[in-house]
């Protein structure tokens, strides 16, 4: 097992071990930060993931962003590839579970990732340099390779305990702004 695989396994177990109260408190803190800084997100093109399990919850965040005038896009896996497309959500949040149990938007209105203003990224763990370890398939790294990251705010959403010293980045890993 590689060091990265070990970190992934360890931090998934840690995340699965937190209480639902801790998850709820983390969500309250996230929503408070966004609410208190809503001018940074209003009227922007924002991609957010639809959280699962004990990831930092994003369901209310997606609704909040829509409510302040952001165009919200959710990732959708492209069949037989390691890439994502970013699909606009409608006001009803019409979603369908894919074969991995991840909720994805049903719509077809896509956006080129370079046209997004903000991309919220999930992670298993992250480091102070802005690198993250995901679930191990590289969907975000492959999908965002080649974007102009100087004009797109890449923000990792995570619980505080998920911060580590070094994620052992590889050449293909994208760097977030935190």
Q: What residue spans do the PLM features occupy?
A:
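Short glycine-rich, flexible loops that bind phosphorylated cofactors or substrates
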Residues: 55, 127-128
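N-terminal active-site beta-alpha-beta segment that forms phosphate/nucleotide-binding
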Residues: 1-115
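Surface-exposed, charge/polar-rich loops and edge strands
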Residues: 2-6, 13-20, 114-119, 128-131, ...
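Redox-cofactor binding/interface segments in oxidoreductases and associated redox assembly factors
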Residues: 48, 121-122
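Aromatic side chains
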Residues: 49, 73, 86, 126, ...
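Short, well-ordered strand-loop elements centered on a beta-strand within folded domains, enriched
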Residues: 81-87, 131-133, 154
């Amino acid at each position: 097992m590689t060091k990265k695989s070990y970190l992934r396994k360890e931090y998934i177990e840690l995340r699965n071990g937190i209480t639902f109260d801790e998850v709820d408190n983390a969500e309250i803190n996230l929503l408070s930060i966004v609410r208190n800084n809503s001018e940074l997100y209003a009227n922007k093109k924002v991609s957010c993931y639809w959280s699962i399990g004990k990831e930092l919850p994003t369901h209310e965040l997606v609704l909040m962003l829509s409510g302040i005038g952001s165009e919200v896009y959710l990732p959708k896996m492209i069949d037989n590839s390691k890439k994502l497309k970013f699909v606009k959500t409608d006001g009803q949040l019409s979603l369908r579970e894919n074969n991995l149990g991840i909720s994805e938007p049903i719509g077809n209105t896509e956006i080129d990732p370079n046209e997004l203003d903000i991309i919220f990224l999930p992670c298993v763990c992250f480091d102070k340099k802005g690198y993250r370890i995901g679930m191990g398939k590289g969907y975000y790294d492959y999908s965002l390779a080649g974007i102009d990251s100087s004009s797109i705010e890449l923000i990792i959403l995570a619980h505080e305990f998920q911060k580590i010293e070094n994620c052992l980045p590889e050449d293909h890993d994208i760097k977030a702004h935190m």
